[in-house]
Regions:
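ABC family nucleotide-binding domain
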Residues: 10-224
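H-loop (His-switch) and adjacent beta-strand-loop-beta switch element
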Residues: 221-233
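Intrinsically disordered, low-complexity regions
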Residues: 4, 25, 76, 155, ...
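Short amphipathic beta-strand/extended segments with alternating polar/hydrophobic composition
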Residues: 81, 234-235
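Flexible, glycine-rich phosphate/dinucleotide-binding loops
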Residues: 214, 230, 238-239
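ABC-family P-loop ATPase nucleotide-binding domain
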Residues: 1-20, 235-270
Length: 270
């Protein structure tokens, strides 16, 4: 099945999602009336300024927190109705995570960190470490297989994190500000790797960012402000549309500026 057909099938559905937190005698509304579909094989960027509700939404979508009301369905399964044990098993089998702070275990080598999700699935050590070595080679770290996180740069640690997230071929990979601690050159390298894995493995990726540059890597851009969706755009061919996206909330357009691509390759919304 090609990418266009894959992206006609929703893998994640959000229905009238609300998240509220009690603060003293008051209630803070962090998310309100969020409804959206994210398609299989799609790269979706949840974009907005600090405090807009991006990370809160990511926590709801990934089952790390339960909504106050509304539903999140992954593959048709309403994850907020699962018990904590069921939810833990579901995340291990169906979800992958890339973190801004890498979240590698310091006492494990690069190979062992990448192989960890397969260990939780009961894959024998020789097979899981072979799979880890293959993915580390793909992200350019064949020379770091036995290095510990403290012996690697931030960009190298994030590449280990990417390999770990994709090793189980999960239904969805969640990436929370995956380049927030990286310089611009390393950011490009890391995002190119994420897009390459997503394309080749037909994976769904949901990334959170406050940086408009990140939207240039997405098929689907969801703009948040004050806990609600204020803009949503879709396109089909991100490999031709690398550039700088700036969300114009009032006109609901996406503007791209990139001197390296002709105007015909730039998505301008509709």
């Amino acid at each position: 099945m090609d990418g266009a057909n894959l992206r006609s099938q929703p893998v994640l559905e959000v229905r009238d999602l609300w998240k509220e937190y009690p603060v003293g005698d008051e209630t803070v509304v962090a998310l309100q009336n969020v409804t959206l579909n994210i398609m299989r094989g799609e790269i979706c960027c949840i974009f907005g300024p600090s405090g807009s509700g991006k990370s809160t939404l990511l926590n709801q979508l990934s089952g790390l927190e339960k909504p106050t009301r509304g539903e999140v369905l992954i593959g048709g399964i309403p994850i907020s109705r699962l018990s904590e044990e069921q939810l833990t098993n579901f995340r291990q089998r169906h979800l992958g995570f890339v973190f801004q702070s890498y979240n590698l275990l310091p006492q494990l080598t690069a190979t062992e960190n990448v192989a960890l999700p397969l260990m939780f699935r009961g894959v024998p050590k020789p097979q899981r470490e072979q799979a880890a070595r293959e993915l580390l080679a793909r992200v350019g770290l064949s020379h770091r297989l036995n290095h510990f996180p403290s012996q690697m740069s931030g960009g190298q640690q994030q590449r280990v994190g990417i390999a770990r997230a994709f090793i189980t071929r999960p239904d969805i990979v969640f990436a929370d500000e995956p380049t927030g601690n990286l310089d611009s050159k390393t950011t490009t390298q890391v995002m190119d790797m994420i897009c390459s894995f997503a394309r080749d493995f037909h994976q769904t990726v949901i990334l959170v960012s406050h940086d408009p540059e990140m939207a240039s890597y997405a098929h689907h851009i969801v703009t948040l402000r004050d806990g609600g969706i204020v803009g949503e755009q879709r396109t089909q061919h991100i490999e031709k549309e690398r550039g700088f996206h700036a969300s114009n909330i009032h006109s609901q357009q996406v503007l791209l500026f990139d001197p390296y691509y002709p105007q015909s390759c730039r998505y301008t919304g509709s």
